Amino acid sequence: MAETDPKTVQDLTSVVQTLLQQMQDKFQTMSDQIIGRIDDMSSRIDDLEKNIADLMTQAGVEELEGENKIPATQKS
């Protein structure tokens, strides 16, 4: 290879740095979106758990014992 022009090296370095910064920004944006969606999903799951517990209470189902659901009317 012939001599490398310092200006060309500086230009290439600048382009690579810009590209890396753009990639980092995109990854950060995606990461923030994913975390936001996970937080939203967590809230929805909490709401679902509460709704299920409320429905079980309304249906007369008490706490689960082991893996079997025992309705309040069948408990001894």
UniProtKB/Swiss-Prot annotation:
Coiled coil: none
Task performed by this protein: Negative regulator of the heat shock response. Negatively affects HSF1 DNA-binding activity. May have a role in the suppression of the activation of the stress response during the aging process.
One cellular component (GO) term of this entry: axon cytoplasm
GO molecular function per UniProt: identical protein binding; transcription corepressor activity
Family: Belongs to the HSBP1 family.
Organism: Pongo abelii
Pfam family, one: HSBP1
GO biological process: axonal transport of mitochondrion; cellular heat acclimation
Originating gene: HSBP1
Listed name of the protein: Heat shock factor-binding protein 1
Compartments, as annotated in UniProt: Nucleus
Subunit structure: Homohexamer. Associates with heptad repeats of HSF1 trimers and probably also HSF1 monomers, and with HSP70. Association with HSF1 trimers and HSP70 coincides with attenuation of heat shock response and the conversion of HSF1 trimer to monomer.
Main location: nucleus
